[in-house]
């Protein structure tokens, strides 16, 4: 064991940038697993979204702008902006506190922040569509268009 430590130390001294890079990647992987394990919401695939909608009466919350929402959204979605959730202006969602909420954004990058706010406001069953509506469209799943 001591030989391994001396070899690792020697390697780190000779290849500092590489050693620091590997350490940073290791820390990021650990952080990602920790964050996922302690998160109060779950990131799910489009197949799981379909199952939740069909079996658990889940509510789909579309976080995109009204214009994007009108161009196409998952059937029966409710359009709520992330700023409304952040400012606790969630009247549209209050009656659905006991339902599973599925948050959908464009590509899955911003819905997590809204999920954190909703779990803090007492919503117990919050999910985020992995890769957002782009994954839904890529899987050739249907969208509803709403005209002005």
UniProtKB/Swiss-Prot annotation:
Q: Which Gene3D superfamilies match?
A: Rhodanese-like domain (3.40.250.10)
Known PROSITE patterns for this protein? Answer: RHODANESE_3 (PS50206)
> What S-S linkages are listed for this chain?
none
Highest rank taxon of the organism: Bacteria
Q: Where is the Rhodanese domain?
A: 54-148
Annotated signal peptide: none
Q: Which PANTHER family does this one have?
A: FAD-DEPENDENT OXIDOREDUCTASE (PTHR43031), RHODANESE-RELATED SULFURTRANSFERASES (PTHR43031:SF18)
Instruction: Name it.
Output: Uncharacterized protein HI_0744
């Amino acid at each position: 064991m001591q030989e391994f430590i001396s070899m690792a130390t020697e390697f780190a001294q000779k290849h500092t940038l590489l050693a620091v890079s590997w350490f940073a990647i290791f820390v990021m992987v650990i952080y990602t697993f920790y964050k996922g394990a302690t998160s109060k919401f779950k990131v799910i695939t489009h197949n799981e979204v379909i199952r939740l909608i069909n079996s658990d009466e889940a509510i789909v919350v579309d976080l995109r702008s009204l214009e994007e929402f009108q161009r196409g959204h998952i059937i029966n979605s409710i359009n709520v902006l992330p700023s409304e959730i952040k400012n606790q202006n969630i009247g549209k969602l209050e009656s659905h506190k006991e339902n599973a909420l599925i948050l959908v954004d464009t590509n899955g990058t911003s819905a997590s922040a809204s999920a954190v706010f909703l779990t803090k406001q007492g919503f117990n069953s919050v999910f985020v569509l992995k890769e957002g509506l782009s994954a839904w469209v890529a899987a050739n799943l249907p969208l509803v268009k709403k005209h002005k």
